[in-house]
Amino acid sequence: MRIFVFVLSLLGLLVGCNRSNPTYEAFFLDTSAREDFALSDIVESVDVLFLNETDDVLVGKVSDVRYANNRWCLLDVDEGRSVVSVFDKEGNALGQLNRQGRGPKEYLEIASFDVCPKTGDIYLGCYPPKVMVFDKELNLKREIECEAPYMGIAKCDDGLMLYGFVARDSVGVDYMKLGSGEEVSVERVKSWRREKNATETIGKNTFMRSAENIYFYTQNSDSLYLANDGNLSVVAAIDYPNREQVRAYRRTHSIYDLPPMERKEYFVPRVHYAMERGGGLWLHYSNVLFGYGVVAKEGVKNYSSKCLDATSLCGNRLVNIVEAFHYDPENFDPNGWLQGVKVNHIKLNDKQRESGNKVLIIYNLRD
């Protein structure tokens, strides 16, 4: 078993709404030395929401989720389909953003999306390269042509943080400042040489919202960043055995050219989501949740545990999506992995269960 050692810049993570950069204290942590924790340490309750889909708002394969202004926005990108479906907090369909086409005010594919927590405006990073902005009624407000496609997008206070191809063999983060009217300026924040087998997925945002903060992670880098208007600050720098050799190999070779048993020697950690709770940082990868620098009664501790599978982190919620016929209350054992967590089940009738509609499993995080 490979051991991953994380060099973390932690503590002082409780950032206020002013988004000022916190002060970090760096220290080493070894994930082989840890204590298990109960999920109730970070999850307060679980809600279950049945989505009342309609003929005009059908949900397919959801790749990302946002929650803002009492609305659920689901990005659905799969096999040529590229739409955003919107539901209210009770699960009633409000509309679907579908402008696929080759003409003006249309897109071929949505690469990533975000929703402004304050206004509810929807921001799309699209192909061909452009950013499209819609209000919460799904009316087009703005269309901004770009030089390259962006696979990640996050709405900050005064602009957009954007991740995508910045050169033939490079990826990077740009900051797009949105001025009054049609005024736009773009500046490069950071870039990396792109690996041959980097696996950023279309429709899965590389930016993660946790409470008031935005985090950024790409497999082309071994760092987790705190992102705000025009800045990336390292929160966790990841180290692991033979890192330099692994990175050198991945820059020029594809691990998929190797026999399956040899590929594991060239795997790197992939962070699926990050969140601050209990005075520390929680990172999720490989279906394991690691808590670093978490303040406990006994002092600062490091934890890990097998964790729930979540599609997205939405502020102070982790969200998973299942089809209605897969929702089974018996899977939420109050005496097992969810001990100490209040689960608010719903009862589905036969018609709902057989509908194929989606159900949101919402894990509400503790403050």
Region spans (language model):
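Short coil/turn segments at the loop-to-beta-strand junctions that recur within blades
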Residues: D55, N98-E106, E145-M151, V189-E195, ...
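Repeated scaffold domains used in trafficking and secretory/extracellular systems
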Residues: K61-D64, L108-F113, A148-K155, A198-N205, ...
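Blade/loop signatures of beta-propeller domains
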Residues: S20-L51
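Blade-loop segments of beta-propeller domains
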Residues: N52-D56, N92-T119
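Beta-strand-rich domains and repeat architectures in extracellular enzymes and scaffolds
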Residues: D47-S82
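Conserved blade-ending motifs and adjacent loop-strand segments that build the rim/top face
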Residues: A236-P259, F290-E323, Y327-D328
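C-terminal motif of bacterial Sec signal peptides marking the signal peptidase cleavage site
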Residues: L14-G16
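Asp-box/WD-like beta-propeller blade repeats and closely related beta-sheet repeat scaffolds
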Residues: E109, G125-D169, S185-E195
